[in-house]
């Protein structure tokens, strides 16, 4: 997770089939809004080898006359569902499906992250890309320039409300009369509520919040915290956010479903046919189900329990490993112990939704960068020792940006938890928007939260796109608070 000073201008980041172990190494340069990702280049796979039965003769003739490109040019957008960077590694539901399809077909992928949906469609229309790996609404407007293909998704708006006894839940639109509902200004949610309110004859109290003040994710969090009673979002966004909160109900739809799919150019129906044939196979269908569970169902917050007892001067059963690794790398072992508690509750066998493993929740690719086989991440000593080296390297890299060693600890923790690329972005945003780029509390932490807003993560100073910073900010605060407690009670 270490990195060099982020360079200016636009660049392309290429990643091989092994996903180069750049992460957490000196000199790693984080990604950018226009990002190219090169995947494995294996044998060229023809359409004939992938074709199934049942297509019309004309479609089969057309498919047989084309070969799947050896390099598939693909565009997508930063979003919590399609593509994002987490701990400096590319992730996302659509991204994962794309990489699996490319590996199965034995082709390379040149992936570009476009700045907007309109620009992405323009890239397809001008022939700059072959495929849009993003859920494009299947409407008459888009069908003029986009031929649908790939995974089918049905999106509809839902009411987000606190989970209550069944008799207290709102289960019918008529029950919205008299209720207060908060939504983003000038959003489709506002327009849907206004139409629904008109259909019901009025009575819904619609509170419109400007995006500069709060985002959809903020409103969902406020419902969970009971700061506001209700909000409205798309079901896929609701499902992802529900994995961060245990006390939400998202079961009530407020609109008709809208189909969305990937897309190719209208004159590339043969490519769409090949992609659809791949998705129709049993193995891809099973993988798709696994990815749906990973991104939309698995809890992001459930770490189990661990009973703390500091009365005897001990924090965990692994204190001797924390002490030794801390001493070898110049880190207070109590800081690392505080991390271990917040990362996994000291559970050596924990595996997160993102694949991070062990007490210190290290990503397998990061482990390999430090010459540790992923199979050994469940070993407490190896896991803690590697985490200490990561923290050491992060501190060295961030010393270029944050001079005060004590203040830098918070930046290092944020980089460990969310990725140094996003921390670099937050530092740049803080400097640009009048905050102190060398102070975490109230400054860079606020800039990190801004990276959930398209207006800011699309800013030229940001190189790593969308980031849900809420959990990382809470992580830094939680670790630092526990660390201060340990300094008073444990030597």
Task: Give the role of each language-model region.
Residues 76-80, 150-166, 236-278, 299-304, ...:
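Periplasmic-binding protein-like
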Residues 297-346, 381-384, 398-402, 491:
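Export/targeting segments at the very N-terminus of extracytoplasmic proteins
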Residues 73-82, 86-103, 137, 158-214, ...:
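Bilobed "Venus flytrap"/periplasmic-binding protein-like clamshell domains
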Residues 118, 133-145, 194-195, 221-256, ...:
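A ligand-binding cleft/hinge motif common to bilobed small-molecule-binding domains
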């Amino acid at each position: 997770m270490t990195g060099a000073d982020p360079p200016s201008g636009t660049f392309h980041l290429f990643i091989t089939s092994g996903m180069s172990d750049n992460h957490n190494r000196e000199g790693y340069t984080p990604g950018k809004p226009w990002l190219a990702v090169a995947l494995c280049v294996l044998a060229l796979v023809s359409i004939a080898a992938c074709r199934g039965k049942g297509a019309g003769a004309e479609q089969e003739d057309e498919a047989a006359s084309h070969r799947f490109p050896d390099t598939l040019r693909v565009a997508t957008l930063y979003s919590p569902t399609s593509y994002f960077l987490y701990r400096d590694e590319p992730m996302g539901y659509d991204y994962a499906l794309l990489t699996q399809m490319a590996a199965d077909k034995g082709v390379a992928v040149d992936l570009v992250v476009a700045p907007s949906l309109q620009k992405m469609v323009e890239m397809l229309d001008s022939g700059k890309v072959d495929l849009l790996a993003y859920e494009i609404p299947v409407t008459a407007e888009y069908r003029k320039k986009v031929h649908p293909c790939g995974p089918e998704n049905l999106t509809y708006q839902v009411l987000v409300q606190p989970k209550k006894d069944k008799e207290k839940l709102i289960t019918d639109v008529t029950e919205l009369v008299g209720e207060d509902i908060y939504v983003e200004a000038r959003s489709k949610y506002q327009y849907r509520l206004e139409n629904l309110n008109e259909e019901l004859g009025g009575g819904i109290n619609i509170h419109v919040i400007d995006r500069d003040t709060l985002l959809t994710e903020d409103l969902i969090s406020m419902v969970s915290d009971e700061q506001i009673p209700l909000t409205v979002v798309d079901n896929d966004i609701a499902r992802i956010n529900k994995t961060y909160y245990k006390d939400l109900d998202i079961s009530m739809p407020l609109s008709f479903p809208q189909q969305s799919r990937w897309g190719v150019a209208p004159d590339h129906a043969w490519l769409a046919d090949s992609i659809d044939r791949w998705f129709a196979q049993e193995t891809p269908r099973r993988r798709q189900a696994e990815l749906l569970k990973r991104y939309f169902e698995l809890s992001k917050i459930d770490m189990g329990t661990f009973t703390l007892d500091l009365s005897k001067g001990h924090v965990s059963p692994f204190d001797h490993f924390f002490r030794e690794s801390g001493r070898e790398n110049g880190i207070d072992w109590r800081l690392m112990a505080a991390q271990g508690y917040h990362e996994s509750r000291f559970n050596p066998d924990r595996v997160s939704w993102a694949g991070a493993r062990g007490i210190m929740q290290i990503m397998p690719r990061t482990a390999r960068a430090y010459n540790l086989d992923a199979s050994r991440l469940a070993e407490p000593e190896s896991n803690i020792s590697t985490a200490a080296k990561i923290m050491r390297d992060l501190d060295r890299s961030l010393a270029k940006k944050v001079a005060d060693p004590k203040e830098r600890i918070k930046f290092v923790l944020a980089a460990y938890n969310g990725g140094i690329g996003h921390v670099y972005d937050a530092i740049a945003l803080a400097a640009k928007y009048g905050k102190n780029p060398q102070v975490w509390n109230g400054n860079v932490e606020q800039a990190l939260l801004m990276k959930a807003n398209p207006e800011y993560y699309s800013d030229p100073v940001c190189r790593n796109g969308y980031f849900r910073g809420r959990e990382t900010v809470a992580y830094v605060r939680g670790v630092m608070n526990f660390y201060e407690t340990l300094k008073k009670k444990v030597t």
